Amino acid sequence: MHEEDFELTFDLEPLEPAPQPKAAAPAVPVPRAAASQPRPPAEPPTPAPVKTAAQPHPVPPARPAAQEAARPAVSVRETEKPRPAPAAHTAAPARGVLISGGDRGIGAAAARAFYEAGYRVAVLYHTNAQAAAALEASLPGCIALQCDVASRAACESAFTAAEIMLGHVDVLVCNAGIAQQKLFTDITPAEWQHMLDVNLTGAFHLCQLALPGMIRRKWGRILTVSSMWGQTGGSCEVHYSAAKAGLIGLTKALAREEGPSGITVNCVAPGVIDTDMMAAFTPGDKAALAEETPVGRLGNAQEVARALLFLAGEEAGYITGQEIGRAHV
């Protein structure tokens, strides 16, 4: 009996279908009606309200979802805008490169390679002012600065001048180095210390000077030039091998420390490269060394320079803490 009474009440409510034309007329307000009419039970008979009763959650969020999707699009762009800021440094003409030991050999070849790629170039030289002047003359706009990398004061002075002239140092190539062939038992403490000061401590000085600006700009490339003897050790070149091995260790550790700041640190460890540092070798010595090289010849400075140029580019942005070398580059 009571159930029949309920049925009578439902029969009385069909009067409300009269407002249904109103709900049908405003097709657009249907979502709003759906949000307000899930309360009355009279709408279950009509399929539209049943759907809207099942869709109250999807429908209201549908609009905010679209709006929120639009908002993130703006915020994403806003978050991406700061990233392109360092990307502005990715254009080669906007970059400045400082190369130590840039007056001859691998350093001079690197200066030419970076210059031809559109970089602003500054090189450091120690005593060969004539070679430095010739490099400046052949590369208009290139700057050559005298510097003994073993001296912290000299590095600070030269780096400040380079930064003023270049605008900023985005790429640092630590290439300055000396070599000496001598039995380990004959090496003097002064010779040992001088080898470390030039080949290892010089890189320490320049890296410390270059890093603050790179960290501030969240972008930078540090490249060190070691040697295969730093990887395998060379007889009669123990102090040289030790210094070059230290340079590889510096590279790997610094890469871990500076990676979060957008700075990569890599090392090139060339094999036997035919530069003026091999002036003391006889043709027979060079031929013997060439036979020990997998490709059967000595390397040249331009090949090493191209490796450095690659590591400085965006294409190598995911490469860090690596040493390219072993037998040869």
Where are these regions (language model features)?
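Substrate-binding pocket helix/loop in short-chain dehydrogenase/reductase
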Residues: 183-184, 191-196, 278, 289
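Short, small/polar-rich loop/turn modules that mediate ligand/substrate recognition or access, typified
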Residues: 259, 264, 319-321
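Residue(s) in the substrate-gating loop at a strand-loop-helix junction
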Residues: 227
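Alpha-helical segment proximal to the catalytic Tyr-Lys
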Residues: 212, 256-257, 317
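Conserved glycine-rich cofactor-binding loop
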Residues: 103-104
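Active-site helix of classical SDR
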Residues: 207, 243, 251
